Amino acid sequence: DYHIERNVTIDAQKDKVFDYIKYLKNQDNYSFWNKQDPEMTKNYTGNDGEVGFVSSWVGNDKVGTGEQEIIGIKEGDRLDLELRFKKPYKMSNSAYMTTDAVSENQTKVTWAFDGKMNYPMNVMMPIINMDKMLGDQLQAGLNDLKIILEKIQTEKRVEPSVPVDSANTIN
């Protein structure tokens, strides 16, 4: 059995961060694994951001075949997922993402995986440093999430340009 988690602090409000991560389709923008196969085929069932939504994929040897399902949402706080891998190995893991306010405009996001390795992969556990391997991949995704959300936050802070009133222009 293993538990792996990583976190990052994002300069954005908690509700905005959660509203982004609860939609699994947004993982296309920040998940390490999505970047491993740009040609990956994706299918979706249900309403994204709601319990029961399933995102499935068929990818290359790096990402394999599987699906993830939203199995729980504590609105604004926690997203629970079940990952079901089909290829190259059949296994099921749980994952979650949480958001915690650090301050009014800062949010700590934690992304964690819990799993169990079955034979023959469990034989490799003493050799494979799952925490480092999977943890580095989680951290890469979180770092990209931070960049995306801070960019969105910055763009929203920009004051809209004031339209020129044509009645006051000199012709």
Question: Where in this protein do the model-derived segments appear?
Answer:
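Hydrophobic ligand-binding cavity/cleft-lining segments
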Residues: D1-G46
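Solvent-exposed, acidic/flexible segments
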Residues: I10, K14, Y20, V63-G64, ...
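Extracytoplasmic/secreted envelope proteins and their assembly/folding machinery
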Residues: K14, F18-Q27, E67, Y96, ...
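Sec-exported extracytoplasmic/periplasmic mature domains
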Residues: K22-N29, G72-R78, N143-T154
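Short, highly charged C-terminal tails/helix-capping segments
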Residues: K42-N43, K146-I170
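Hydrophobic-ligand binding "helix-grip"
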Residues: G46, V51-F53, V58-Q106
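Beta-strand/loop substructures that line and gate deep hydrophobic ligand-binding cavities in soluble
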Residues: E82-Q139, L145-I147
